[in-house]
């Protein structure tokens, strides 16, 4: 967004391919936290950097937590 102020040397958003996203989601369902070795191997297989995979997993865990909290709130309100 042009209204937001970012560092001029900020890396642009990574456009993940559909196949990468499917692989990332599958791996996340298996395991929400990767070891350094797992992350290195997995990122290499997807042709992504370890940092990209690390950040994707951080964001996905935050999303999972947000969805879980919304579900709990929905159940609480319907009780």
From Swiss-Prot:
Protein name as annotated: Homeobox protein H17
Classification via PANTHER family: HOMEOBOX PROTEIN MSX, MUSCLE SEGMENTATION HOMEOBOX
KW DNA-binding (keyword) present: yes
Molecular function terms, GO-annotated: DNA-binding transcription factor activity, RNA polymerase II-specific; RNA polymerase II transcription regulatory region sequence-specific DNA binding
Biological source species: Apis mellifera
GO biological process: embryonic morphogenesis
One annotated Gene Ontology cellular component of this protein: nucleus
Subcellular location: Nucleus
DNA-binding region positions on the chain: 9-68
Keyword annotations from UniProtKB, A to Z: Developmental protein, DNA-binding, Homeobox, Nucleus
Family classification: Belongs to the Msh homeobox family.
Pfam entry (one): Homeodomain
């Amino acid at each position: 967004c042009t209204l937001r102020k970012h560092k001029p040397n900020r890396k642009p958003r990574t456009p993940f391919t559909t196949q990468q996203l499917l692989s990332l989601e599958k791996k996340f369902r298996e395991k929400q936290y990767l070891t350094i070795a797992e992350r290195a191997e997995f990122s290499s297989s997807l042709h992504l950097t370890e940092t990209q995979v690390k950040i994707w997993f951080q964001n996905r865990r935050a999303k999972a937590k947000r969805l879980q909290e919304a579900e709990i709130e929905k159940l609480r309100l319907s009780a």
